[in-house]
């Protein structure tokens, strides 16, 4: 697949995305069907017979399925199970293992029922207190297996709508607990709906560009192995490049792709954040944000969780990815018809320290 992408002419990248990366309708329906089966199981029967009452307040689809950026053939989904039993972030950290254990037990038990035709293949975890339960789901009506990560989470946000922002007090509590526990970014799952909403309303073509960048990242991962920066960092970098460099619904895909790879090569200068869900207005949040933004670069703060620097702590991974990006910038997918390089968007690598409402 690497050969196909790098040798694709720049003016045919949209076609490449359409043919190789966009999931077809039947595939999407399969994944949706599998998710519905699992959501019903988690909400209605998983905790039905537990000794102590367990209340699932909601099950939220996260990851690429939730954001609408799934790649063709990549049938995976994150399901975040919000439990009213958790009373704090620390409580989630300490008790998530017991709920994962219960979900695992119920998956095994339901398989014994003859009328239940869905099969679960649970992946073993060696961690004593795992963040997620990973398994594969298969069923007669599905064309292929679907991989799931189920993550128990504290329902700190309650009801979330597209147009309302969290109370700043939620972030002050988050920051306080993360500092006392030394667990920055540990509770990002609690903000899954905000992460999803941040991307969900974006233009279709931007989501296609995200798919292209994710595909490129997967090719790099196959070639380079670990360590690499997290894929989410590349997704956010793509959104940032589009917002600051173009921002229109229709754009040149090759120019956008080139811009993102150039930003990867400048990783040591990156300092990126958004003020959509949190900002500098609350003194405690402002103090913490300034501290985060003074950290060694690259810094890319999760737009939903200020404690999560999704680009941090992996200089070697960025160095290796940047080296690969420099190679790719010489390939035909970044050349015009006459052989000259495709131009890139003008994008600052360092976001100004001001309250930017996007």
Swiss-Prot record:
Regulation: Produced as a latent enzyme which is activated by dsRNA generated during the course of viral infection. The dsRNA activator must be at least 15 nucleotides long, and no modification of the 2'-hydroxyl group is tolerated. ssRNA or dsDNA do not act as activators.
Matching InterPro entries: 2-5-oligoAdlate_synth_1_dom2/C, 2-5OAS_C_CS, 2-5OAS_N_CS, NT_2-5OAS_ClassI-CCAase, NT_sf, Polymerase_NTP_transf_dom
Molecular function GO terms recorded: 2'-5'-oligoadenylate synthetase activity; ATP binding; double-stranded RNA binding; metal ion binding
EC numbers, comma separated: 2.7.7.84
GO CC annotation, single: mitochondrion
Residues binding Mg(2+), per UniProt: 76, 78, 149
Predominant place of localization: cytoplasm
This protein's UniProt keywords: Antiviral defense, ATP-binding, Cytoplasm, Endoplasmic reticulum, Immunity, Innate immunity, Magnesium, Metal-binding, Microsome, Mitochondrion, Nucleotide-binding, Nucleotidyltransferase, Nucleus, RNA-binding, Transferase
Cofactor(s) the protein requires to work: Mg(2+)
Reaction it catalyzes: 3 ATP = 5'-triphosphoadenylyl-(2'->5')-adenylyl-(2'->5')-adenosine + 2 diphosphate
Any GO BP: negative regulation of chemokine (C-X-C motif) ligand 2 production
Chain intervals for the UniProt region annotation (Interaction with dsRNA): 14-61, 201-211
UniProt binding sites for ATP: 64, 211, 214, 231
Localization (cell): Cytoplasm; Mitochondrion; Nucleus; Microsome
Role description: Interferon-induced, dsRNA-activated antiviral enzyme which plays a critical role in cellular innate antiviral response. In addition, it may also play a role in other cellular processes such as apoptosis, cell growth, differentiation and gene regulation. Synthesizes higher oligomers of 2'-5'-oligoadenylates (2-5A) from ATP which then bind to the inactive monomeric form of ribonuclease L (RNase L) leading to its dimerization and subsequent activation.
Family: Belongs to the 2-5A synthase family.
Oligomer and partners: Monomer. Homotetramer. Interacts with OAS1D.
Protein name: 2'-5'-oligoadenylate synthase 1A
Species, as recorded: Rattus norvegicus
């Amino acid at each position: 697949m690497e050969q196909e992408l790098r040798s694709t002419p720049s003016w045919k990248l949209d076609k490449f995305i359409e043919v190789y990366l966009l999931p077809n309708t039947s595939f999407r329906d399969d994944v949706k069907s599998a998710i519905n089966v699992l959501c019903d199981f988690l909400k209605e029967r998983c905790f039905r017979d537990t000794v102590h009452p367990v209340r699932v307040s909601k099950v939220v689809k996260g990851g690429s399925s939730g954001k609408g950026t799934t790649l063709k053939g990549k049938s995976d989904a994150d399901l975040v199970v919000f439990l009213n039993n958790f009373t704090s972030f620390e409580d989630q950290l300490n008790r998530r293992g017991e709920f994962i254990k219960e979900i695992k037990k119920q998956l095994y038990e339901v398989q014994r029922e003859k009328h239940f035709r869905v099969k679960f293949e649970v992946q073993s975890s060696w961690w004593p207190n795992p963040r997620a339960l990973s398994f594969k789901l298969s069923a007669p009506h599905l064309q292929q297996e679907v991989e799931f990560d189920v993550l128990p989470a504290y329902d700190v946000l309650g009801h979330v709508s597209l147009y309302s922002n969290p109370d700043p007090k939620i972030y002050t509590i988050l920051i306080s607990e993360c500092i006392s526990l030394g667990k920055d970014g540990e509770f990002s799952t609690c903000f899954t709906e905000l992460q999803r909403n941040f991307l969900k309303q974006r233009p279709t073509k931007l989501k296609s560009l995200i798919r292209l960048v994710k595909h490129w990242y997967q090719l790099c991962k196959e070639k380079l192995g670990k360590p690499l920066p997290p894929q989410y960092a590349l997704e956010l970098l793509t959104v940032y490049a589009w917002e600051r460099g173009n921002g229109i619904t229709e754009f040149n895909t090759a120019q956008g792709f080139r811009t993102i790879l150039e930003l990867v090569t400048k990783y040591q200068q990156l300092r990126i954040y958004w003020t959509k869900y949190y900002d500098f207005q609350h003194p405690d949040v402002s103090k913490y944000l300034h501290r985060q933004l003074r950290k060694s670069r690259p810094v890319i703060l999760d737009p939903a969780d200020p404690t999560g620097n999704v680009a941090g702590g992996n200089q070697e991974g960025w160095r290796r990815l940047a080296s690969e990006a420099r190679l790719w910038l010489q390939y035909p997918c970044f050349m015009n018809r006459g052989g000259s390089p495709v131009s890139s968007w003008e994008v600052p690598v360092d976001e100004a320290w001001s309250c930017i409402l996007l």
